[in-house]
């Protein structure tokens, strides 16, 4: 390889790779996106009614939200610990792998709960995969739920594995 094409210092490739993997895995965990998604789901659940009461008041739904909330808080704290260690000059540790695994599992649990909450309104209408020329009464968020659910099935196997 010509010297002008070398990036960084020769012999430091693995050090650079670990740095990149740490940040890739941390970003795939998606704690801020998970927080926004959970908050959005809870807000939408206030407008979804089942047996004349909002889904947000259903004890089973609340229990699932609480478990995701607890696991998300743990994920956020782990992310902050990893970033603090990096700031102190310590190399990336196992946190990045843990973040990637737990974060992607949380993404899948959240999209599963969102799909469950949206129910039949998650059936896609319009676009290349939906039913064309149908009147749609569900919200855009509900219509995107199935696509997000299906898309997030892949996150556990890409990036940093």
Predicted regions span which residues?
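Enrichment for repetitive, rod-forming helical segments
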Residues: 25, 32, 69, 107, ...
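Residue-level recognition of specific faces of alpha-helices
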Residues: 64, 95, 148-151
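C-terminal helix-coil-helix/basic helical segment that borders enzyme active sites and/or dimer interfaces
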Residues: 50, 59, 73-136
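Hydrophobic, well-ordered secondary-structure elements that form the walls
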Residues: 65, 103, 160
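Charged/polar, solvent-exposed surface patches and flexible loops
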Residues: 19, 43, 47, 84, ...
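Glycine-rich phosphate/cofactor-binding loops in nucleotide/flavin-utilizing enzymes
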Residues: 6, 11-31, 121-161
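Glycine-rich beta->alpha junctions and the first turn(s) of the following alpha-helix
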Residues: 1-75, 155
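Short basic/hydrophobic patches in alpha-helices and adjacent helix-turn junctions
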Residues: 67, 105, 116, 154-155
């Amino acid at each position: 390889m010509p010297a002008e094409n070398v990036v960084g210092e020769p012999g430091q490739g693995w050090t650079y790779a670990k740095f990149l993997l740490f940040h890739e895995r941390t970003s795939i965990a998606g704690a801020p996106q998970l927080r926004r998604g959970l908050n959005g789901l809870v807000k939408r659940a206030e407008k979804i009614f089942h047996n004349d009461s909002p889904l947000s008041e259903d004890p089973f739904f609340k229990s699932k939200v609480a478990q995701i909330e607890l696991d998300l808080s743990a994920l956020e704290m782990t992310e902050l610990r990893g970033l603090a260690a990096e700031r102190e000059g310590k190399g990336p540790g196992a946190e990045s792998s843990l973040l990637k695994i737990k974060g992607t599992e949380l993404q899948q649990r959240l999209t599963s709960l969102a799909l469950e909450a949206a129910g039949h309104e998650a059936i896609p209408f319009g676009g290349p995969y939906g039913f064309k020329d149908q009147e749609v009464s569900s919200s855009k968020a509900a219509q995107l739920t199935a696509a997000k659910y299906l898309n997030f099935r892949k996150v556990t196997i890409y990036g940093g594995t």
